[in-house]
Amino acid sequence: MIGTAAYRIEVPKTHWNGKLAVYAHGYAGDGNKLAVQNPLLRRYLLDNGYAWAASSYSKNFYDVQAGVEDTNALTLAFNNIAARNGRPLAVPTRTYLFGISMGGHITAAAIEAEAQATTRSKAHYDGALPMCGVLGDTELFDHFAAYQLAAQQLAGLPASTFPDPNWRAIAPDVRTALFNSTTSFATPTAQGARLKSIVMNLTGGARPIFDEGFANDGLQKVVWDGFGRTGDINGILVNNTSVVDTRRIRYRFDAPDAVVDTFNASIKRIVADTNANPLRSDGVRWIPKINGEFNIPVLTLHTLGDMYVPYMMEQVYLQRATAKGNAGHLVQRAIRAPGHCDFTVAEQATAFTDLAKWVETGTKPAGDDVLTASVLAQPRYGCSYTDNTVGVDDTATVKTWRAKGKLPACN
């Protein structure tokens, strides 16, 4: 244990390459039981000579602050832990940080200038691989709120306050007004079609696999079950403060301009509390910021149909990095899949290999344009880095979705 956080470390017995890969796991719920999670890349890492390490973090919930601090602490403790276990090792020649979902937020935040300056445990990383990450930090929660507000508005049950105290009571009526089934998102009503158009634009614009993602009932249910919550992110922020802000959001859907303008003028706008997520003197923020201030190679992966951490997170990340002059350190890749983090191990392994080569040789790998609307709308968008090859370490969900004929082909 490091404090109250458990950890797991594996080092190849005979062929360690002198390099360490540190894994940041995703959201593990709001219970008290902590657990270390193995990365799906475990076999790849060990077979290729990498040591790997992962923390349980000292807290669950959406506690990215704990994730950053505990992951950094484990990275710094690697050599001492190895020595205590009878295997003294040289300091790693390279240290890579990678993670999924909330772990993608942790990965991207840990390499930011702000977190590097304020963290209690100042670990250095040579390259980072955030996958399906919350790369726009609190903008994800703005998106969830905007989605809910749009649904209520289109259902004729508009919100007048946030959070809406009546949400649980009216949620069934909202669903009925927008979808032809209470158990499926695949067949929207006329108003539901407008909602689908709004969500498409909120999540990144017209692109392949969005239709399959919007119709992904399991993931949509997770999103809708989160509607009605306060903006304190399940108590992560103190004093009932809220980071949610929808003032800048423009809702776009297929209708005459006057109709769209009226919709935008009448929908409830949420204003964040100004000091909800301040800088702290005892470590990183409760919800660490991703400002685009990083100076190491970063390669990202994101699925096109993700409704839980949508593709627009990649767009926000690039815009922030560009504003800080750091876009040259960033490569982004789109994957044609309809769920959250449902990459094949082959896709992850290729990304890690390319990142390591970039760090060690200076040769920057290729990636996708994540901003140009006409590029995203092309039928083959996302084909370049999608690899439907599955193996023993892939999840059942990934194997099901990547089966031939399940998704639009890249031919």
Predicted feature descriptions by range:
Residues 14-16, 73-101, 123:
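Gly/Ser-rich "nucleophile elbow"/oxyanion-hole loop immediately N-terminal to the catalytic nucleophile
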Residues 98-107, 128:
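Gly/Ala-rich beta-loop-alpha elbow adjacent to hydrolase catalytic centers
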Residues 104-119:
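Short glycine-enriched nucleophile-adjacent loop
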Residues 307-313:
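Conserved alpha/beta-hydrolase "acid-adjacent" motif
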